[in-house]
């Protein structure tokens, strides 16, 4: 991953629409290892476009910076200051956000340490 000092990330990246009401801004990415860090922003009332849980092939860490996020399958809501660490293969979601949320997310390939 590229090294940066403090800066305004919007000078290097923009918000990209993932699905209605859900946007991502990639802060840094290593295309060789698959590792990346990003911000994900959900508008109030946003929900996953799928009704099935997500399963990734990478390790995912999520910190809720502000707002709320509800796991619809578990019927459990998570709030500002909460953190998740998910190993590859862990089912989670689908999600909805009543008031909207902003999350800091990192994705790490399970074999990135071998390179």
Identify the residue ranges that each predicted region occupies.
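Conserved catalytic motifs of the protein kinase core domain
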Residues: 35, 60, 100
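A short, N-terminal "cap"/entry segment at the start of jelly-roll beta-barrel domains
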Residues: 1-36
């Amino acid at each position: 991953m590229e090294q940066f000092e403090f800066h305004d990330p919007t000078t290097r990246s923009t918000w990209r629409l993932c699905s209605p009401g859900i946007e991502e801004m990639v802060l840094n990415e290593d295309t060789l290892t698959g590792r990346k860090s990003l911000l994900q922003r959900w508008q109030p009332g946003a929900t996953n476009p799928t009704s099935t849980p997500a399963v990734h092939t990478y390790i995912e860490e999520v910190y809720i910076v502000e707002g709320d996020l509800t796991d619809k399958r578990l019927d459990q809501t998570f709030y500002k200051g909460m953190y998740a660490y998910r190993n590859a293969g862990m089912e989670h979601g689908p999600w909805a956000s009543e008031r909207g949320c902003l999350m800091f997310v990192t994705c790490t390939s399970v074999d990135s340490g071998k390179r």
